[in-house]
Amino acid sequence: MKRLISSAIAVTASVMFAITNIHAAELEEIIVTATKKEESLQDVSVSVSVISGDKIQEAGLHDLKDIGQYIPNFNVSENAISTIASMRGVGVGANQSFEQSVGLFVDGVHLAKGRQFRTGLFDVERVEVLRGPQGTLFGKNTLTGAINVISAKPEIGGDFGGQISLAVEDENSANIIDGHLNIPAGDNFAVRLSFKDREDDGYITNAYLGTTGPTADEQMLRFSASWQPSDDLRIDMKHTDGEHVRVGSTVVQKTFDMAMPPTPTSGLAFLVAQNFFPSFVANVGNYVGGEDLNTGATKGAMQTLGINPVGTQTNTSDTAINISYDMANGMNMKATIGNAKYDYVDGIDADFGPFQLVSRDDWSEYEQDS
């Protein structure tokens, strides 16, 4: 009896040992640079979440606003004039002159303005989200946290080849094509070309125009080069150009008020619409759905009204050079040189009526060196 029990224990122990080895082989160590050096995610002392480039492509995440759906306590929101990043519910206002309280770092270069958070994601190795003040390692404008985006690098000594992927989204009638090509040149130099083209027709119907929105057109192109002349020295360079155009808004029209007595704004809008766009007035009543106010469609109907939807166009250009040198005393010296610039034009229908009586155009240019 004792011999049988001993055999059973031995068999159980061996099975458990085998299962443990299988799980150990399946687990992949995640390396991050949240503390300015390469460490295992398990050893990092700060609160950090990581999402890989493969997951970003698999989930169809196009920008940092989409990343917020997967990362706890992180959110990026957009309004007509600005982009606001917040961590744990804390952010800055919509004033475009403000710098964000959440620092954005792309390949080591700090991008301080909210408009730069609209930069699309493509050919990314990983995105690290650090929660809490990060001023000690990342400097100012990281009061609530930091976002560390690491682009995919050329593979020195790797194979010549690449990848192209095509995605189609039925609900938004969106088409996305992206890819990259790795070109090795010798044993210590390689080049990587990557691109992304995205067209999104939107999911809200404009009842007057018969079109959908908000539409988004995005094109991005990146050139990367890596040179490793010795085991101690490596230089990585990348340059990215991008264009982002969006027309329309998810805001539902709420100023076309036919209730009595009419307000000055709604009365003027109705007067103009009745005389210049009579079909608009008829269209409003067709699918208000029994509301007391003829304010257009409800959010539930996923429809909006308007002749001149708001629009925005942003052009970006970013360059980063990273130099890493392992010194003889075991220390590592790193240097980052960067240039980032953008320009944008925003068109806003300020009267919110069917006829664009009052409009406003905003434009700006920005450039930084670091």
Where are these regions (language model features)?
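Outer-membrane beta-barrel transmembrane strand signature
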Residues: T295-S324
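Outer-membrane beta-barrel translocator/receptor signature
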Residues: A85, Q100-S101, K113, F122-E125, ...
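Acidic, small-polar-rich N-terminal luminal/periplasmic segments of exported/outer-membrane proteins
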Residues: A25-I156
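Short polar catalytic/cofactor-binding loops
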Residues: T33-E38, E169-N172, A225, D241
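N-terminal Sec signal peptide and the immediately downstream disordered periplasmic leader
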Residues: M1-A59, K65-Q69, N182, D231, ...
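Flexible glycine-rich, low-complexity coil/linker segments exposed to the extracellular/periplasmic environment
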Residues: P261-G306
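Periplasmic-side early beta-strands and strand-to-turn transitions of outer-membrane beta-barrels
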Residues: I156-G158, A167, H180-L271, Y342-L357, ...
